[in-house]
């Protein structure tokens, strides 16, 4: 009886992580982006890095780079905002690229007081709003089942290899039950070390 239960448990555990186990792996962000094929943008492209700290990253080599962070900065291209509570401080359809490196795992899935809110869903709505049509969102985040997903006590939003494809893509759109209003195509996803790299393209 105990052996049968053991194997049933193994089967359930494998089912929950098999999607991540079967994903492509790359050694670096550069290798991942190269595998995504040509990413077209205009000469005067703009990129926004969310949760950028003091140094926004620019993997798409956009001509203009902006950053948003919860901490104030003397750099004029870094704007202070708490994206768990505030909108992205840029106009609609203004960015060719939005990136988030080790950031979305810090954005709560649900807040109950004073009213029920879904900050992660709200952030994805904001990303969709600020991106230009066919713009790209690149996420780099610790992924389940790696311990990096949980070790940091400020990681409150564990991401799996299926989070984006089930809740935010233009097929299943499960996020709509929580207020997601946008739509993304999943261009590519892969594992790099203990992290999931996801490239999404805005769809209207």
Task: Briefly describe each language-model feature range.
Residues 149-181:
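Conserved Class I S-adenosyl-L-methionine
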Residues 117-133:
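A short glycine-rich, Lys/Arg-flanked "PGG" loop and its adjoining helix->strand segment in the class I
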Residues 1-93, 97:
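Conserved N-terminal segment of class I S-adenosyl-L-methionine
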Residues 109-120, 148-156:
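Short, flexible/disordered intra-domain loops and linkers
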Residues 142-147:
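Short "lid" loop at the C-terminus of a central beta-strand within the Rossmann-like core
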């Amino acid at each position: 009886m105990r052996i049968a239960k053991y194997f049933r448990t193994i089967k359930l555990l494998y089912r929950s992580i098999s999607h991540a186990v079967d994903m492509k792996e790359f050694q670096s962000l550069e290798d991942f982006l190269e595998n995504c094929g040509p990413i077209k943008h205009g000469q005067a492209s703009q990129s926004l890095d969310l949760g950028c700290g003091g140094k926004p990253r620019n993997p798409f080599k956009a001509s203009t780079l902006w950053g948003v962070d919860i901490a104030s900065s003397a750099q004029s291209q870094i704007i202070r905002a708490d994206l768990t509570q505030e909108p992205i401080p840029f106009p609609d359809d203004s960015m060719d690229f939005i990136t988030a490196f080790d950031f979305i795992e810090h954005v709560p899935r649900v807040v109950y007081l004073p009213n029920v809110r879904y900050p992660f869903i709200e952030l994805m709505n904001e990303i969709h709003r600020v991106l230009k049509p066919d713009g790209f969102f690149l996420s780099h985040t610790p992924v389940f089942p790696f311990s990096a997903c949980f070790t940091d006590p400020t990681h409150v939003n564990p991401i799996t290899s299926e989070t984006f494809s089930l809740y935010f893509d233009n097929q299943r759109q499960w996020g709509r039950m929580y207020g997601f209003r946008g739509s993304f195509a999943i261009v590519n996803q892969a594992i790099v070390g203990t992290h999931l790299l996801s490239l999404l393209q805005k769809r209207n």
